Amino acid sequence: MLFVSCPRIIFNAHPALRIKGKPVQGQTVKALLSVSLREVQDVEYLFCKTQTCPVVYFSPDSEQTFTVEHVRERVYQKEPDGDDVFVCYCFRHKGEDIRAASSETVTAIVDDINTGINAGQCACDLRNPQGSCCLGNVRALIKRISTATAVLESPR
């Protein structure tokens, strides 16, 4: 996987790209990091969704930065085309599950996720590196696959 380099700079945004990160709860960071929790300061953390950057979590002052190597799970936003990367962390649906599925099976996957959410069985704040529900990622992947399929199937 190719990443851009991320030099440390002090800026109230992503340390390398100078874009705003998505705020995540401290419990998300603590649950998903593979480092000793002694290394995790009690500060605000932001999530970097930029695919070409190895940084996953960073503090606004860039004093704390954690990369893909520090996270227990592979991060979908960093590897959106990875077949064996989870798109849904709570109910364990991978990109390959969705890419290989028929339209009926895709509907069943979305229904499975919705059923789990409605039953209170999801823990996106602890299991998903972005710290929030995966359903948007799942639907975006389905749309991307559907669009790519339509382009491939259109007459030229």
Annotate each predicted stretch with a short phrase.
Residues 1-3, 25-36, 68-73:
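Short Cys/His-rich Zn2+-coordinating modules
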Residues 3-8, 39-47, 77-84, 106-126:
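Immediate flanking context of iron-sulfur cluster ligation sites
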Residues 10-17, 48-50, 88:
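Short cysteine-rich clusters marking metal-coordination/redox-active sites
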Residues 15-40, 105:
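Short recognition patches in nucleic-acid-associated and regulatory proteins
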Residues 17-24, 52-60, 94:
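Cys/His-rich microdomains that often coordinate metals
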Residues 41-66:
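Short metal-binding segments enriched for Cys and/or His
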Residues 65-95:
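Extended interfacial segments that mediate partner engagement and assembly in macromolecular machines
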Residues 115-156:
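Long, compositionally biased
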